[in-house]
Regions:
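Short, electropositive alpha-helical surface patch
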Residues: 65-75
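Terminal peptide-recognition signature
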Residues: 14, 53, 99
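Glycine-rich beta-to-alpha active-site loop
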Residues: 59, 75-121
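Short, glycine-/small-residue-enriched flexible loop/hinge segments at domain edges that mediate gating
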Residues: 46-62, 84-88
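Conserved small/polar residues in nucleotide/adenosyl-binding loops
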Residues: 122-128
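A short, well-ordered alpha-helical element
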Residues: 25-49
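STAS-typified acidic loop motif
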Residues: 7-33
């Protein structure tokens, strides 16, 4: 039977753009507490067949990256939703980790896709001029 009232396929979209973590005076980075409610809302839409996530991040805080990644996977499993990730200009380090929460990842051939990196700090003591 023909019907003009077809079921619409709904795919909520989440846009994550910026450095991961509380960055700068006005905390303009991407952090879990700032995204938690938005992510939860996207996955709670019952008619949604999937959740789309656009990521544009060079990385940043590994803790925030893991929190966001794990929360996306947890809600995807709980709500039985597919996650489709679109890497925009850059998805590197922690941005790439969040991308790995997707069941599918799409990127432009010009996008910068990086590895999940590591940052290490060291203390270096240099001799003073008198000791040289």
């Amino acid at each position: 039977m023909f019907s003009i009232f077809k079921k619409k396929k709904i795919v909520p979209h989440i846009k994550l753009s910026g450095v991961l973590g509380n960055v700068g005076k006005f905390k303009q980075g991407i952090d879990f507490s700032g995204q938690e409610e938005l992510i939860k809302k996207a996955f709670s839409i019952k008619k949604a067949i999937a959740v789309a996530i656009s990521i544009n991040s060079p990385g940043g805080s590994p803790v925030q990256s893991h929190l966001i990644h794990d929360y996306i996977r947890q809600l995807a499993k709980k709500n039985k939703k597919k996650v489709i990730v679109f890497a925009e200009d850059v998805a590197a380090s922690g941005g790439y980790l969040i991308s790995c929460a997707g069941d599918e990842i799409y990127a432009n051939s010009s996008s910068i896709i990086g590895s999940i990196g590591a940052v290490s700090y060291t203390h270096l003591t240099l001799p003073t001029n008198r000791e040289v």
